[in-house]
Curated annotation (Swiss-Prot):
Taxon lineage: Eukaryota, Viridiplantae, Streptophyta, Embryophyta, Tracheophyta
Pathway entry: Lipid metabolism; fatty acid beta-oxidation
Record-level Gene Ontology MF annotations: delta(3)-delta(2)-enoyl-CoA isomerase activity
Homology family: Belongs to the enoyl-CoA hydratase/isomerase family.
Marked site (Important for catalytic activity) residue numbers: E133
Name this protein carries in UniProt: Enoyl-CoA delta isomerase 3
Organism: Arabidopsis thaliana (Mouse-ear cress)
Amino acid sequence: MCTLEKRGDLFLLTLTGEDEHRFHPDTIASVLSLLEQAKSQSTKGSVLITTGHGKFFSNGFDLAWAQSAGHGAIKRMHQMVKSFKPVLAALLDLPMPTIAALNGHAAASGLMFALSHDYVFMRKDRGVLYMSEVDIGLPVPDYFSALVVAKVGSGIARRELLLSGKKLKGEEAVALGIVDSAAHDSAEGVVEATVSLGESLAAKKWNGEVYATIRKSLYPELCRMVDLTANNLATHNL
């Protein structure tokens, strides 16, 4: 399902297996638990890198699980939307820089998971970003929209992401300012690039709590939507 490995100052969270890494309630709980573990073990210089195995980074919520409930499908969808919110809140509140290394496709809530990181790297050779909701007739959760507004600066890019049903490849996603890099020819290459960035960030030995507070202050509306508050900076270090 997912694992957390510590390599010096770096935490590597991996969505394991060759499946689509759909966010089922059990997967959501597992990811949240590992983020809490990384937070509890963090020190000055800690950095989180998140990646996956196989063709998909994550293909979104487990729609098949929801639909298997028949008349209870809507209730299950609401359950996943509600339980996923703390995952994004945990990433925004994590006292360290965060980097998403997209090994493959990132769609719907899988893309929102990626964009909740401070940096997003894609592969050049494969993988797309895709917000499928407009194509399949599902409304976008309000906190997803708040995340896109917070993290994607251009109105054109937001339109392409949410209103076009377009599958964006790496170079186009970089050009639109959605991801930071897409110059990597393999899953290993994108992880290596994020490890290099992670090590350079770790060397700065920043105070993680201060880092998280500044991050939250950048996105006040998003933090409100995911039930976080941007606490004032502690003054004892000033």
